Amino acid sequence: MVLAMLAWAGSFVSAKYLAMYINEHELVTYRYLITTSTTLPVLMYLNISYKIDLRNLAIAAITAILLVAYTKLFFLGTKIGTASFGGALITTLMPIIAFVIVLIFSKKKPIAKDWLALFIGAIGVSTMLEVWQFDLDEIFSTATVFFLWAATSWALMSVATAQSKSVSPILLSFYIYLIATLFNTVFFYENVSGSVFNMDAIFWVNILLMSIASTTFAATVYVAGMQRWGSKCTVFTFLVPFFVIILGAVFLGEAIQLSTIFGAMLTVSALMLINNISLKSLRS
């Protein structure tokens, strides 16, 4: 599980390298084509049928479109911003946004704990943005806007996939990747960067890491973890923002900002409140 979270964090660093080679439309097609191809052996190994009903297929289609949007937004944000900040902001903000969406559309009224969690989360995000230093134009720079919309897209994906019933999560993921590949290739893809087979080793290492390690591997391990440990598995996702910060410093030379670390800690605390996770349960 730790390796899976490390691989997911690595996707933000890989995006920074890939931005030097291809655009966002090419990235989506190449990434999810490889991911779709490498998910097939997983389905075969686990003996999972390819059959899916229309309801779950429709959910997969909606999620695929949101996935295309998320991937392009976080890629564009990382291209002009920093991978460490973007990764920390997105991975801590998206579950909070998902929680707010569920609160809005459900009949359940938020309790005091929920309001406290949202308040702590807001303080954490504000700390990462360093709102005390800039005016509004600087706070909501182009990169930050991309990251915020990316987090929102992923949150909507989480809400959509939660509606799926009686389907293997890995099978649902396979159709999401397949539809995302087809949708992007038909409507957006245009080869403007030349043949990928002429790209150097740096490109191939990063596209394979992003496609296989951070998507096929990480998603499969996470699903297996959820089946074995249930909701306790979510605690591992709290490692992602800190892994992103470390990887950004090691591979990209990005400065480690105390505001980013402290803000991530606050938002992780908010997520622990939302998920009813205590320090005692983490130790166990």
Feature names for model-found ranges:
Residues L18, L27, R31, G77, ...:
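Hydrophobic/aromatic residues within transmembrane alpha-helices
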Residues V28-Y30, F85-L93, A160-T181, I212-V250:
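Helix-helix packing/entry segments at the starts of transmembrane helices
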Residues G10, S14-Y17, Y21, T35-D53, ...:
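Membrane-interface helix-cap regions at the ends of transmembrane helices
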Residues D53-L57, A88-T91, K107-T127, D137-A143, ...:
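Loop-to-transmembrane alpha-helix entry segments
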Residues V13, T36-T39, I97-I104, Q133-V192:
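Transmembrane alpha-helical segments that form core, pore/gating elements
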Residues E26-S37, L67, F75-K109, A150, ...:
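Specific alpha-helical transmembrane segments that line the substrate/conduction pathway
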